[in-house]
């Protein structure tokens, strides 16, 4: 009867081990099949079109030259109202270095003792009574100590640059005259897509006569560049590597 129970317990342990192994393998496989979430954040406002901007109407006076269609010699053609287009010259360079080093050492040692007047094999006085304590010498000593240390070091370097141009649209005119702009550019190459999104606030004085402005003069810039093609996948670690970095305890 004992042998039967032992064999049954071994079979149960084997089944449980196989079940745990199967769950671990399934988790790894499913994590590899899961797609990497795309970080394409939406803007706080809707796309620029259609803007439903009312067309300015000028009464017809019957003349060959209408005042509403006239362009004066000193007219400023720079963007200044909702719907106007501005070209942003991208010249973004980012170079960051960070180095941290920490070291921690702590040591603690404590000793205390109890002195006795009894010799080996004699009686000692404990709470007013005589107690025979074999092996008690001149005293009892107790000591303990603890040591702790920690050392950490990190060195992070990041460098990136982005150059080019993107056309954006004025979506809002603030009360102080500054312009809120936004725009995006989608480029599909083979099986991948490159997406550039740009948003910010510009001063009309910084806009050149040809309706261009450098990105360094734009305030509150929100610049997103995303590559969903093969080249973008090569810059990201695989699913197994991501899983190990997230759940591996060491």
From Swiss-Prot:
Membrane topology: Lipid-anchor
Residue positions of covalent lipid attachment, annotated as S-diacylglycerol cysteine: 33
Superkingdom of the organism of origin: Bacteria
Protein localization: Cell outer membrane; Bacterial flagellum basal body
Position of the signal peptide: 1-32
Main location: membrane
N-palmitoyl cysteine lipid attachment residues: 33
InterPro entries in UniProt: Flag_Lring
Pfam families referenced in this protein's UniProt entry, alphabetically: FlgH (PF02107)
GO terms, molecular function: cytoskeletal motor activity
Coiled-coil segments: none
Keywords, comma-separated and alphabetical: Bacterial flagellum, Cell outer membrane, Lipoprotein, Membrane, Palmitate, Signal
Example of a GO biological process term: bacterial-type flagellum-dependent cell motility
GO CC annotation: bacterial-type flagellum basal body, distal rod, L ring; cell outer membrane
This protein's record includes keyword Lipoprotein: yes
Quaternary assembly: The basal body constitutes a major portion of the flagellar organelle and consists of four rings (L,P,S, and M) mounted on a central rod.
Role of this protein: Assembles around the rod to form the L-ring and probably protects the motor/basal body from shearing forces during rotation.
Family (UniProt): Belongs to the FlgH family.
Record's protein name: Flagellar L-ring protein
Species: Hydrogenovibrio crunogenus (strain DSM 25203 / XCL-2)
GN (gene name): flgH
